[in-house]
Each structure stands twice: as C-alpha cells, then as structure tokens.
C-alpha cells in the first residue's frame, strides 16, 4: 500500500503479456475492488468497462469515463477492437453513470445507445501571463503560427492538417508538437 497526496495506491500484479495485459489487469483490478469495501468503482476507458457487469453482479455502483472511441484507433485490430466495442456496449447498458469528454462523444452515446451521459471536458487553469521566450527559439512570433498540439498518431488526422495547410495562402507557420502514443508504432 502506497499513499500519494492522501490517495491510497493499491498495486495489482498481472502477468507480463502485451496482448492480454489490459484484459487481465482489468479483471484482477475489478476483483480486487469488489472486495475492497468500496461503494463505487470508476472504470476508465472502454476496455476496463467490459468488467462493469461483473461489478454490478456484486451490487456495486459503476461510473465509466470514456476518453475516446478506442476501438477506432489504428493501433488496435481484430480481437482488441471487438473487445473494446464490447466494453463500450457494457458501459452503455450497465454503468450507473458515463462520463464523456466532448459534445461529440455525448452525441455519439445518445445516437448509438440512447444513453444520456455527463460531459466533463478536460481543462486547464491558464497562466495569467504566458512565457513567450520559447517561441523565439523556434523562429516563431506571437499570433504568427498555427499550432497542432497532441499525440502524433494516425487517428488524429495530422496528414489532413498538412494537406489543408498547403492550400492556405498564409504567412503563418504550421507547428506540429506532441508525443507519440504509448504503442510501439
């Protein structure tokens, strides 16, 4: 048992198998939560949400946060895609509440599952004044660039951004910044 800023962290050991790690981890974490004395289990993402029916069998309240439609991501295929869609359906059918991060995701659940969701968008507390010194390091000026900031993965459609930028008549520079996904791609 570890503690981080007043939050207890409980480790759930799983076998080291890339292909099944997420499924096995979700199962073991759910079983541990079932017997941990918790009133509510909060599942993050579609894959872990496949375990919601198990938790409901034990009378637990379940909240699921859907961060995106993971099954649409290019890194998944075959069984993983089907499992993620299964988890999405289990969340829609059995979760007490579903949290989504955008209006489009909220509409997706309404259209696809006739399911109401709670939208809580990601946000930040912007600094009162921005430090513009990093701009000069890259030859950029305030309001002189178009910025993409996010994971650099195929499903973000950065190639469409580049194609669209090439058609613009602008003096603004295109800046693409971000990291890769946690996948091996």
Language-model features: locations:
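Carbohydrate-associated surface elements
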Residues: 104, 123
